[in-house]
Amino acid sequence: MKKISITLLLCLLCLTGMAQGQKALDLKDITSGRFRPENIQGVIPMPDGEHYTQMNADGTQIIKYSFKTGEKVEVIFDVSTARECDFKNFDSYQFSPDGQKLLIATKTTPIYRHSYTAVHYIYPLKRNDKGVTTNNIIERLSDGGPQQVPVFSPDGTMIAFVRNNNIFLVKLLYGNSESQITEDGKQNSVINGIPDWVYEEEFGFDRALEFSADNTLIAFIRFDESEVPSYSFPVFAGQAPRIDALKDYPGEYTYKYPKAGYPNSKVEVRTYDIKSHVTRTMKLPLDADGYIPRIRFTKDANKLAIMTLNRHQDRFDLYFADPRSTLCKLMLRDESPYYIKENIFDNIQFYPEYFSMLSERDGYSHLYWYSMGGNLIKKVTNGKFEVKDFLGYDEEDGSFYYTSNEESPLRKAVYKIDKKGKKTKLSQQAGTNTPLFSKSMKYYMNKFSSLDTPMLVTLNDNSGKTLKTLITNDALKQTLSGYAVPQKEFFTFQTTDGVKLNGWMMKPVNFSASKKYPVLMYQYSGPGSQQVLDTWGISWETYMASLGYIVVCVDGRGTGGRGEAFEKCTYLKIGVKEAKDQVETALYLGKQAYVDKNRIGIWGWSYGGYMTLMSMSEGTPVFKAGVAVAAPTDWRFYDTIYTERFMRTPKENAEGYKESSAFTRADKLHGNLLLVHGMADDNVHFQNCAEYAEQLVQLGKQFDMQVYTNRNHGIYGGNTRQHLYTRLTNFFLNNL
């Protein structure tokens, strides 16, 4: 396969496929999304507990459906009929808590992974006695410019939002009067109500702003990032989109980015009294360098929940603050000899008398139930499996709903435990189930897929009974039947350390055990991640298998789904055991009669790119070629929250950082290497690629490199993805 062009290879494969009545896959089919399953977008359960809404495909309507029947009830919003509507389509929407108003987002502009600005509109849904909307005039939320994270008050009469790092309040009963709550917000200095870059990226949220249950207070987190070091990257005129203002001289984007060991933002929780206009700062006993990853008002307006972590992230505290006296009381503490996983925050849900929590205190992630006084009532789940998500508690019958991998680390199922402790599995098929429950907990929409089943969407009641099938993707199955598509199969093997690892393998369609095939290994390998899952997908790896490669993915030590001991065994020295496991995978594959052991390659993106470099320089010359896309190369270059969670600081763990650096073992790099990076990567900075490339140059190591102008960590836009995957394909065709 060496030095063969894609065009020639596809011609040969097409001739073979045509003889069988099937077409060969084309790279454009993959990058264009031709085989992307049909899905339901923009689904929101309505406050009444009986209905849900969804956007239509072109973003012009919001349609109401019955959870019980799946039948369309009515169109509750249409851009063509809403009076004084000055936009043609919209991007997203939300309901007021009472279900009487819509907040509609248009002209959405992404900022980072979760954050964006948008122009929002308010639309009334109130009906008269005849069920007719009494006022269908749509109004702008604000004329002062795009907004971030707008949130309704519980009674639906107010909306708070952030603009330019300051918080604003709009009172809907007073002609949408707008007032500014904070005045000190300033770019790269002070942020109110939204997280800074590292909080957003690593704690996974974009709003730090909450109303109290009695509509009298707004609580928010204030970030002072003035002492956080800045990072800048160049911005060029580029293409797709073109920035004409930079056609002669490039610009620069600067933002605050705390690298491992450097200062974080100073954080505090404040409350604003809407009536008296008084702002108070909570007296929170937080370490000077501690984190506040979430705040949330409970059902009691006098109890503001504040979640904190110490900088090592091995101690989690939940405080209840009195928003007026500012006093804080510790309600719960959870500690780990390693670190507390970030999925804990959104699985804490508050009810009038109770709250939920996920903890790994017994070695596996399980659901715990507490009184609002902070006393443990019971451990709801138990066993050598992981609870993935707490879905909710039915206050009427005392039942708990959650997803877990009890069946297999590769699968996710939906379960119910009633108040007597009886457990019932609700999901009917083995694979990956992702449910969305109604507000009443009586119904749920389930999205299911498995290795051989693309997205299947059903409506179910809370006993698991299927009420209606919404999406089958039969049309996609019919389309795929005309193509020669390689299929995944699971396998396991045991390493020389006696560790059992899970993997999947895709063989070429016309696989023959009497032949020897080149192998391309794909992996991510990051802490807590999983790539080996019983879920459906067609990707670039599928395309490579169609070209005659055996494609393999193995989740090594440090990945998720198998309990704390397996996942956290890499603590303080990430990258070392993971690389050894990828090398052992290659050695295991090389012993198979159908594998050409001299033609094994590896690739990955982000942490997977880092693992490519670590594996190719592990000291065992088993890889002939590898591609590292957007790879961190030295953890001193990466952010505080992610890096220190697993490694602590460079000062505390100097030897661990040295062993975990791709620089340390670069002299042992073996095989043909392609480095790929976006120059506008705000997450894994281009610095990682540039410095590692210089290291290879000085070591006399030859390598290939592909740089993408103005592209971030995702490396997309215009023709970029097509170019990227063509580059990767050609590299492996010529070097493997």
Identify the role of each PLM range:
Residues L27, T31-S32, V75-D86, S179-E201, ...:
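Surface-exposed loop and turn segments in beta-propeller and other repeat-based domains
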Residues I40-I44, E50-I62, D91, L103-A105, ...:
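Non-catalytic accessory segments flanking enzyme active sites
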Residues T53-G59, S66, F95-P97, L103-H114, ...:
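Beta-strand C-termini and the immediately following turn/loop, strongest in propeller blades
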Residues G70-E71, K107-Y112, Y116-V119, I181-L209, ...:
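Predominantly five- to eight-bladed beta-propeller fold
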Residues E71-T109, I137-P146, E335-Y338, K384:
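Blade-loop segments of beta-propeller domains
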Residues H114-F168, Y174-A208:
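Asp-box/WD-like beta-propeller blade repeats and closely related beta-sheet repeat scaffolds
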Residues I221-I377:
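Beta-propeller domains
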Residues A301, N433-L736:
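Serine-hydrolase catalytic core recognition
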